[in-house]
């Protein structure tokens, strides 16, 4: 039986990010390579355990936190690796003057959607596992803007009107 490798490209709407999706061995191992522009950060999301993110190019930081708790910051650069804990929200921020490129590998994907994969692209407001920019803690964006200023970089994400929190 031969192994099948499927590659496909997609452009995510959230931040003009470019992705190449990788599916190996009938999708028992999958991943993606993402490139995010300068001055951009991604929406927070969560999923099950076992995703490994390797930074191939660029520098920045990620925030990670379990639901209902305060986020913690983790800085990274080329060849850094991180693995978000099971069901922890995480969010990635480009602090460099060049696009970041990251490789994410995991033992699940579209064919075997364990670990909440199928909920990652659905808003938490709709019962999913992705926090829309309008629903995030405003301090997250403010911290990023301040960090970008130190580097002489402008925020490229679209403006946000935050929803009222209960």
Model-predicted segments: where are they?
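A short, N-terminal "cap"/entry segment at the start of jelly-roll beta-barrel domains
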Residues: 1-28, 32, 138-166
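Conserved short histidine dyad/triad with adjacent acidic residue
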Residues: 13-19, 30-47, 88
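Short histidine-centered beta-strand/loop micro-motifs
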Residues: 23, 41-47, 73-75, 93-94
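Short, conserved secondary-structure segments in the cores of folded domains
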Residues: 32, 51, 70-72
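Glycine- and acidic-residue-biased ligand/ion/polar-headgroup-sensing regions
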Residues: 37-38, 46-67
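Short beta-strand His + acidic residue motifs that chelate non-heme Fe in jelly-roll/DSBH
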Residues: 42-44, 62-63, 84, 90-96
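A short hydrophobic beta-strand segment most commonly corresponding to one strand
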Residues: 53-54, 83, 97-118
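Short acidic-glycine-tyrosine-enriched beta hairpin
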Residues: 66-86
């Amino acid at each position: 039986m031969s192994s099948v490798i499927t590659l496909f490209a997609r452009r995510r709407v959230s931040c003009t990010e470019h992705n190449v999706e990788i599916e190996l061995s009938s999708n028992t191992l999958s991943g993606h390579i993402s490139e995010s522009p300068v001055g951009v950060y991604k929406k927070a999301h969560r999923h099950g355990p076992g995703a490994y993110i390797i930074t191939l190019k660029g520098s920045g930081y990620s925030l990670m936190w379990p639901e209902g708790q305060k986020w913690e910051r983790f800085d990274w650069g080329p060849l850094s690796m991180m693995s978000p804990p099971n069901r922890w929200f995480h969010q990635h921020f480009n602090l460099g003057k060049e696009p970041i490129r990251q490789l994410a590998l995991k033992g699940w994907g579209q064919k075997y959607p364990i670990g909440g994969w199928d909920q990652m692209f659905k808003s938490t407001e709709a019962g999913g596992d992705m926090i829309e920019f309008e629903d995030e803690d405003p301090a997250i964006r403010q911290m990023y803007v301040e960090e970008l200023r130190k580097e002489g970089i402008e925020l490229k994400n679209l403006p946000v009107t935050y929803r009222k929190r209960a």
